[in-house]
Amino acid sequence: PDFAIIEACQVVENGDVIEIVPTAGVGNVPTFCRLADKVIVELNEAMPATMRGMHDIYEPADPPQRREIPIYTVSDRIGTDCITIPAEKLLAVVKTNRPNEVGAFTPLDEVTEKIGENVASFLEAEMKAGRIPSTFLPIQSGVGNVANAVLGALGANENIPPFEMYTEVIQDSVVGLMDEGRIKFASGCSL
């Protein structure tokens, strides 16, 4: 049989189904759970069960029935807050207590800071020229030092209004800008 081993912050028995709340990363976990014959859940008690509600778990249909993914704004929600599996698929729940291990980025240097300033200045100029609305547009950010420099420069630029963003990983710089009110909403695959 095929097995899926996944991490969760909460596992709830709800009749014939098990509700699994992932931790900081979802990615392909719903697909692994759907395709596996048996699922082993690592219940990580270092991750708060209050993470339930952060996730928007959605799997598109297989072709040829696949349709567009109906996300039209950054804050749209189209899925569920947990992964559900039939109760008979759950093989085991193994408890652990391990915080996320996140590698640190090197500090920003003159080059990365200048890149950030240039991007922010370019976007500001595009707004002033009318090619970007005065309310700004959602951005898509990568991960790492250059992304942090760009986000920092956008956040520091008073002529750029609070904005929304898509990203693969909602990293510390994004959370900081959310706390400051500079990012209104962020959508990502991992925290």
What does each model-identified segment do?
Residues 1-138, 145-191:
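Conserved phosphate- and dinucleotide-binding cores of soluble alpha/beta proteins
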